[in-house]
Every structure is written in structure tokens, then in C-alpha cells.
Amino acid sequence: MIFDKVNYKEFDKEVWEAIQAEEKRQQNNIELIASENVVSKAVMAAQGSILTNKYAEGYPGRRYYGGTECVDVVESLAIERAKEIFGAKFANVQPHSGSQANCAAYMALIEPGDTVMGMDLAAGGHLTHGASVSFSGQTYNFVAYNVDEETGLLDYDAILKQAKEVQPKLIVAGASAYARTIDFAKFREIADAVGAKLMVDMAHIAGLVAAGLHPNPVPHAHITTTTTHKTLRGPRGGLILTNDEELIKKINSAIFPGIQGGPLEHVIAAKAVSFKEVLDPAFKDYAQKVIENSKAMAEVFLANPNFKVITGGTDNHLFLVDVTKVVENGKVAQHLLDEVNITLNKNSIPYEKLSPFKTSGIRIGSAAITARGFGVEEARKVAQLTIKALENAENEKALEEVRQEVRALTDQFPLYEGL
């Protein structure tokens, strides 16, 4: 067979070397990007399997191509496991991403031009919750709700008042940078009060929901969407859940043939494997440690007057920090920390005064370091090293000390043994 005997390390040296460099980067860097995680070898193996060869438009038992009996088994397993994890009656595991899951949910719930309320991007929302640069803001009439300017917390009374004024057809709950527990039951009350549907995007907290450590939105939302990576620790992809039989029909049609063609069955296999991992009791222990590590890091920042932790702490895997007392902006902080092998992202904070390309804040997440085995002691050390770097931006000696301590930590907790 053509190319079947080719050693790709030699055939495509450029790609091989880039992959090796990325493996080295991940091994030697402390990963604090809240949307990233470290998948298991089993998940990687499933995603790299022979299923990548198979085209399978449609759904299990209802395909447009033949030879789908094996991928039907895999996709059915993924569906059943997702339903079991979140207590949902129906699931679609085909979305290629969380954004596509959200797109399909909108298509199932509303019409172009309808009014929708979504969380303000700077307050912690997501691009697909109505940002003008996103399909969501360009297709629907999104009106943003915000957080309290003093506390940074969701103000449900203010959201209800705004909903009564706006009269949306849909309310979107969920966030990409909100550190506190979200009351989905309260959001449903607000939606019901104005005759709106409720959609929840739980992409960031899905792993915590799965472990029973954050309220489950599925009983309250008409549709719940999520990614399958982040705190779920699976492959990159999307998932849609609902308890409504009529809505799952609309969701399925919106995904295929609406916005996607053939599903990525190798990725769905990886989703199935990761869902089985989530169902294992060990996953709850992992998720609990994710929260403990996040709180431990936040406490270190809270104790330092040079930094402001938005909302005054965290209930989940992430928190935001205003860094403008020590560096010019979040972009500068991100680049500075890159130099000492600590990876995170600049992030807008509520009522942001700087552009989204600079920002006043950084976002810090604990999911990836926890997957590597970091505990509370190491998490505190990571926060201390982050602060040391930010407070010594012009001190090369101090920055080199941080690099060395980062390397000591990453050597102590290998990314993958024998990869």
C-alpha cells in the first residue's frame, strides 16, 4: 500500500520535529490555561485509531454509508456513557467543538434575529454567547447581562429585571471565565418568568458537574452543551444534552446535515474512552483535587496586595487576577510568564478598561497541573513562582531562579511515562 512502509519521522521531518518540540514544551512547562488539560494515553490511542478511515454520515442505525456496524457500537457507547454521566435522556456526541455544539443548540431553539441574553464577554462569557465577531452575535440579537461591578458576582435579581425589559426568546447561562458556582435553577426561574428557553454552556465546569462537585444544569436547561476536553479531560470536541425528545430531533438535524457532514468517529471513540474514565470513582477524586488546587493558588494571590483576585476567590478550576499593579497589562504578563515556562492566558476582567488584545487580567486554571499529579503544596508553589516572576519582570536573576524551580517541578511530575 502506498506510504504504508514509510517512517514518518524521516518522511516528514518538519512535522515530526514540531511534534517532538511540543512534547518537550508540554513536559517542561507548567500549564495553567484553564481550557487545557492532559488526556490519558488511552484517549490518545483511541483518537489515533483506524476509525479515522471511516466515513459515517448520519447516526447509529441510520447511516448513509455501509460498513458502519463497528462505528455504530463506538458512537452508541459514547452516547450512553454521556447520558449516564449527566443524567440526561438524550445526547449527541458528534459536534466537532463546543462552538458547533452551541451553534446547533441555537438552531434547535430559536430563529435568526431572535433576542437572546448571554453573559458579557468581559464578565466571563464566551465568544459564542453573543460577541459581535462571532456567528452568534451576527445571527441573533444578543443582549449581554453582566456581573455586579463591586463583587464580580452574577446578580440574579438584576438579570431577572433585565430579562423582563428585553423579553428574550432564549437565555444562555455558563461562562469561560467565571470562578463561582452558577445557580442554574435560578436561571431557569428567570427564563420561565419571561417565557424564554434556557440553554446552559457548561464547557468549563463539565468535569466538576460530572463528579457531583458543581450543580448539574441538565435538569434545569432545555439544552445543555459542553466541550469534552477542559475539566472532562477528554479529546477536543463537543457534546449536547437534553431531556426533551422533540429537541433532540432538532439538535440531531442541526448537527447533521445542518452544520456538519461526517462525524469524526476516531474522536468519538476517544470521547467514549474518556467518558468511561469519568465514570470511574477515581475521577471524582481528581475533580476534587482540581478545586483544592485552584483554591490553594487563589489564596496565595489573595494574600498579596499587588494582585486583585476577581470575586475574591474561586469555587471551581479557575480564577482571574488583575495584574496591572505589577505589569502593564495581561498581555505583558502572559509573555513574561512564557519566558519562565509558565503558560497561561491574558484575560479581560469585568468592566474591562483595556482592549481584549491587552487586558487587565490573567486567567489561571488548575485542571492540567492536577492531571500531572500536582497537589496543594505544589499548587501553592506554582502561584508563588508566578508572582515572583511578575514582581521581578526586569530582574533576570530572579527570573532564572523561577525557571529552575519550574523545571524541578516538571521533572518531578512527568507528563507521560515512557511516551
From Swiss-Prot:
Necessary cofactors: pyridoxal 5'-phosphate
Gene3D superfamilies: Aspartate Aminotransferase, domain 1, Type I PLP-dependent aspartate aminotransferase-like (Major domain)
Keyword set, alphabetical order: Amino-acid biosynthesis, Cytoplasm, One-carbon metabolism, Pyridoxal phosphate, Transferase
GO molecular function terms listed in the Swiss-Prot or TrEMBL record: glycine hydroxymethyltransferase activity; pyridoxal phosphate binding
Recorded metabolic or biological pathway in which this protein acts: One-carbon metabolism; tetrahydrofolate interconversion; Amino-acid biosynthesis; glycine biosynthesis; glycine from L-serine: step 1/1
Chain positions found as N6-(pyridoxal phosphate)lysine: 230
Residue positions binding (6S)-5,6,7,8-tetrahydrofolate: 121, 125-127, 246, 355-357
Domain of life: Bacteria
Compartments reported by the entry: Cytoplasm
Entry-linked InterPro entries: PyrdxlP-dep_Trfase, PyrdxlP-dep_Trfase_major, PyrdxlP-dep_Trfase_small, Ser_HO-MeTrfase, Ser_HO-MeTrfase-like, Ser_HO-MeTrfase_PLP_BS, SHMT-like_dom
Record-annotated disulphide pairs: none
Catalytic activity: (6R)-5,10-methylene-5,6,7,8-tetrahydrofolate + glycine + H2O = (6S)-5,6,7,8-tetrahydrofolate + L-serine
A biological process term (GO) from this entry: tetrahydrofolate interconversion
Residue(s) at site: Plays an important role in substrate specificity: 229
EC numbers, comma separated: 2.1.2.1
Record GO cellular component, one term: cytosol
Free-text function comment from the UniProt entry: Catalyzes the reversible interconversion of serine and glycine with tetrahydrofolate (THF) serving as the one-carbon carrier. This reaction serves as the major source of one-carbon groups required for the biosynthesis of purines, thymidylate, methionine, and other important biomolecules. Also exhibits THF-independent aldolase activity toward beta-hydroxyamino acids, producing glycine and aldehydes, via a retro-aldol mechanism.
Complexes and interactors: Homodimer.
Family to which this protein belongs: Belongs to the SHMT family.
Protein name: Serine hydroxymethyltransferase
